Amino acid sequence: MRMMIRILACLAFVLSGVSAGAQSFYVSPKADQAIAEKLLSELHAIKSGSPDVPTSGLMVEAAMKLMGTPYVAGTLDTDPVNEQLRIYLTKTDCILFVETCLDLALTVKEYKACPDFVQFAWKVASTRYRCDAPWGYGDRIHYTTEWIRRQDKVLKDITLELGGKVYDHPISFMSTHPDSYKQLGNARNIPRAALALQKITETEAELNRTPMTFIPKDKVAGIESRIKTGDIICFVSAIEGLDIAHVAIAYVKGGKVGFIHASQAAGKVIIDPKTIAEYVSSRSNLAGIKVVRPL
């Protein structure tokens, strides 16, 4: 019954968004929309010239065009009360950067004609939320593990194929650290926060039914040669309860297996000077990596 109510609520939200006008379901400054539409046009031109271009190829093209974008943490959480689909291309963090590149590529692949911003926004909604439209903080896909599993039609986790193994590392960070999140704080006294915390706790339990996998940090150098440009690299956390600490896009050039990412240290999107193996081995908070390949 609870699931039916959620489905009906989501459907009502979507229908109300359509009837109220295309812009009602997202928040995005005009400058960000302009960047997105420019990228969609440029990626569409690439696809038109090379119809067989893979999703990974379009992702890397998008990543290169977003080089230098400022790193800003917490861009989705500026309003702890009203959960909205927020889309920014003038600022980003690590997961939003990869999400944006993937969604730009998927949107261009999906449409024959050049897609517009609204079509891109619907794609972002479908990958960021469990229900194709935002209606609560607890409905956002917070854990990268869930994000990967829910995109199984367009992404393939190849961690085990590369020699990875099961990682006994249950996910629980958000439910055990609710005060670290504005939307979950004081859940005992705020019904909205209590509901979000309940949904997140249920999600954690569901995710933990399937074991995590990873390539240990001391094994990464041995499999680097099998990583391809455009693969999504998930840096697995060594912190109790947390699944993924950082996300990037693999970039192989001149035999060097590097990566493109929104770097907090650099304060912007960069091609990191380190290889993937060098990066993961230099950080004590990382246990290893997952490798996810766009289909």
Language-model segments: residues:
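Bacterial N-terminal signal peptides that target proteins for export
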Residues: 1-8
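Bacterial N-terminal signal peptides
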Residues: 8-17
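Sec/Tat signal peptide C-region and signal peptidase I cleavage site
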Residues: 18-22
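Cationic-aromatic interfacial patches
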Residues: 24-99, 106
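Mature, folded catalytic cores of secreted/periplasmic enzymes
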Residues: 38-48, 57, 112, 214-218, ...
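Acidic/His-rich structured neighborhood in mature extracellular/periplasmic domains
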Residues: 69-208, 252, 261-264
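Mixed-charge, Lys/Arg-rich low-complexity intrinsically disordered regions
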Residues: 196-226
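C-terminal soluble interaction/assembly domains
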Residues: 220, 224-295
